[in-house]
Amino acid sequence: MDKIKIYYDGLEVKDDIRIKGYTTNPTLLKKYNKSLKDLILPVIKKLPNTPLSIEVNSDDSDSIISEVQEILSWGGNIYIKIPIINTKGELNLKIINNLLNQNINVNITCVFSKLQIDQIFNNLSINSYNKLIISIFSGRIADTGISPSILCKYTVELFKEFSNIEILWASTREVYNIFDAINCGCHIITIPEQIYEKLSLIGKDLNKYSKETVQQFILAGQSL
């Protein structure tokens, strides 16, 4: 796993050198029943230099700008997560360009299609002074019966000349997606808690795993 950076999808700080960053979204934060600031500040205090992607919860430009200013005032190594489109399906590239031109690190999220990737490539003010993450929602793409690897490989190839741009495999569904992402050339993959808990299974002896599974089923049957 040294070929890709693993970001944890959540705010439970892990004492684990494999975790290189953290990401959040409004759905994840909802379960904590706290304000965004109260959730983020303790993480920044513990990990001031670790990349932390925080998604805005606004849908119009003025509200997004106001929210971004508030988030950046907290310090830390913040990436502002902006969806590629708003709830009306309109591109957010104007506000994203605005942030990039201010040398604010951005994570473009909720990316699903080649059209969106091409729109990013053709319309963004990309330079070497700011850092940009492009988050492809691979798991949700796979849910539709389409391989996300095609889009990920295309995106990696398209942006390969930009050392400040990283492609992220998001919406991870299973441990093997880590190796899918590596094979695509992705720089980062996010993993939720249920995948993090399974990392210890990597490299496990399959014959032993088979035996343990049979034992588990027998125990379950005996308890009926």
Can you annotate each of these PLM segments?
Residues D2-N105, S138-I141:
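Active-site beta->alpha loop and helix N-cap motifs at the rims of alpha/beta catalytic domains
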Residues E90, N97, I104-E197, G203-G221:
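Catalytic alpha/beta core domains of metabolic enzymes, predominantly
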Residues L224:
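Aromatic-anchored helix/helix-loop segment that forms the rim or "lid"
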